[in-house]
């Protein structure tokens, strides 16, 4: 049994964490991004498939490649963020299953048309993207996840000639409280859950 996290840790991860729309002009080091990934990789995925592929866009050149794919409402904040993580998924993730899941022939479960693997790759990369948000918060970073972009343009700019497709984007850095909207409500347990 794991130890219970204290209230301050739960606040940092969930209760007081906010989706950031503006970031301070403070760089995020490559070492910190590597530390971030080294936490994310331990999150569970089906058959340990780990289909997510991450591109951490930090340079002016990278942001210029990303800019044409961004929706109008997301462009300014994304270009200003120190890091934009592209959460992608590898439709040929099963090729690594002999290494990642050696105690069964898991690769054979996903052999066949690539489209048959897309659902699992998308679902599990979404999990891994959520782990990235929580890991970022645990490391003192703030996150701003987004879906407002043109997937085909991102794929052409960053994943051309590969079996990788984009899922969603997450801006990362140190949030500027001035850019926050008022805290929005959440559904109560009785509105969103039930016990069967």
Swiss-Prot record:
<dbReference type="Pfam" id="PF00881">
    <property type="entry name" value="Nitroreductase"/>
</dbReference>
<protein>
    <recommendedName>
        <fullName>Putative NADH dehydrogenase/NAD(P)H nitroreductase XCC3605</fullName>
        <ecNumber>1.-.-.-</ecNumber>
    </recommendedName>
</protein>
<dbReference type="InterPro" id="IPR000415">
    <property type="entry name" value="Nitroreductase-like"/>
</dbReference>
<keyword id="KW-0560">Oxidoreductase</keyword>
<dbReference type="InterPro" id="IPR029479">
    <property type="entry name" value="Nitroreductase"/>
</dbReference>
<dbReference type="InterPro" id="IPR050461">
    <property type="entry name" value="Nitroreductase_HadB/RutE"/>
</dbReference>
<comment type="similarity">
    <text>Belongs to the nitroreductase family. HadB/RutE subfamily.</text>
</comment>
<keyword id="KW-0521">NADP</keyword>
<keyword id="KW-0285">Flavoprotein</keyword>
<keyword id="KW-0520">NAD</keyword>
<dbReference type="GO" id="GO:0016491">
    <property type="term" value="F:oxidoreductase activity"/>
</dbReference>
<dbReference type="InterPro" id="IPR023936">
    <property type="entry name" value="RutE-like"/>
</dbReference>
<keyword id="KW-0288">FMN</keyword>
